């Protein structure tokens, strides 16, 4: 027992009431460290109402907040990863998969839904960073291709939200092959004139940033998202120089022309609807009066 525990154990002061607060009611902003009511944070789509910091959000939750409520269907839901290489690092790959599936409730790191956005048919995908860092393996690549092919078949836009540390090392070349596979299907979409919008969220790194995440007809980022190939610490250790302030953050990339827009999560739905209706040459879902109110 420490000295401070001994002092408090002898203290005559005791509470007649026990704290009866369930776990998970409160959480803390990862930026400003403000204590937040969990339900309030969820209503703000995991954006801190105090400082505006965009925290990571569950992939399925993100997509359901984007799409209209009716007519949502999941694509390639039956695909599940396999440990073809019998890979083992500190743990077996199959054990890592089991743990990630239990923690997230998903079979792999990409969720693909088909639905509408203000009545406009779209296909939308989102990475789940909670599933092995959103890493891209064979199933993620296959789901991405399935989403792109569905968009081409329906002649509707495809939107993908990336949040990934890169290629999944446990699948070795099977993972790296997905970079070429996803890039190839996007080239096919481009030939057919089907729009693809890439939304880069925190973080988008490695093989994902080096493939489909930067191949959008329009590339959007959330505020302060970390975007790049290697992380800033790795680069600093390699070049042995101090990087510029904000290097690899969304604002730095926008200033240097690497992305097209930065959009807050609260504005994402309306912004995507406006962009997609223009790309598809469809009537805007907003009338002139509504647009003037938002400007």
From Swiss-Prot:
Keywords: ATP-binding, Cytoplasm, Fatty acid biosynthesis, Fatty acid metabolism, Lipid biosynthesis, Lipid metabolism, Metal-binding, Nucleotide-binding, Transferase, Zinc, Zinc-finger
Pfam families with a match to the protein in the record: Carboxyl_trans, Zn_ribbon_ACC
PROSITE patterns, A to Z: COA_CT_NTER
Names of the cofactor(s): Zn(2+)
Domain CoA carboxyltransferase N-terminal: 25-294
Zinc fingers (C4-type), renumbered ranges: 29-51
Record-level Gene Ontology MF annotations: acetyl-CoA carboxylase activity; ATP binding; carboxyl- or carbamoyltransferase activity; zinc ion binding
NCBIfam families (UniProt xref): accD
This protein's name: Acetyl-coenzyme A carboxylase carboxyl transferase subunit beta
């Amino acid at each position: 027992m420490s000295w401070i525990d001994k002092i408090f154990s002898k203290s005559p002061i005791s509470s007649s009431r026990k704290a009866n607060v369930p776990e998970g009611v409160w959480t803390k902003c990862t930026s400003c460290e403000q204590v937040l009511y969990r339900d309030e944070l969820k209503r703000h789509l995991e954006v801190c109402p105090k400082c505006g910091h965009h925290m990571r959000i569950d992939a399925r939750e993100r997509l359901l907040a984007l799409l209209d409520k009716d007519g949502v269907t999941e694509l390639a839901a039956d695909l599940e990863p396999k440990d073809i290489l019998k890979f083992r690092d500190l743990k077996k790959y199959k054990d890592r998969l089991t743990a990630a599936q239990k923690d997230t409730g998903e079979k792999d790191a990409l969720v693909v839904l088909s639905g509408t956005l203000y009545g406009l048919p779209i296909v939308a995908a989102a990475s789940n960073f909670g599933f092995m860092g959103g890493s891209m393996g064979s199933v993620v690549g296959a789901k991405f291709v399935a989403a792109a092919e569905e968009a081409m078949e329906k002649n509707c836009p495809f939107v993908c939200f990336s949040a990934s540390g890169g290629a999944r090392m446990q699948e070795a070349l099977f993972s790296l092959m997905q970079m070429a596979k996803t890039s190839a299907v996007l080239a096919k979409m481009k030939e057919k004139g089907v729009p693809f919008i890439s939304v880069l969220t925190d973080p988008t790194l490695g093989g994902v940033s080096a493939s489909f995440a930067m191949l959008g007809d329009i590339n959007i980022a959330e505020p302060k998202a970390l975007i790049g190939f290697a992380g800033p610490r790795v680069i600093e250790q390699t070049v042995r120089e101090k990087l510029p302030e904000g290097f690899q953050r969304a604002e730095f990339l926008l200033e240097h022309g690497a992305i097209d827009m930065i959009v807050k999560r609260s504005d994402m739905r309306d912004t995507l609807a406006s962009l997609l209706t223009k790309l598809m040459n469809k009537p805007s879902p907003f009338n002139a009066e509504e647009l003037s109110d938002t400007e």
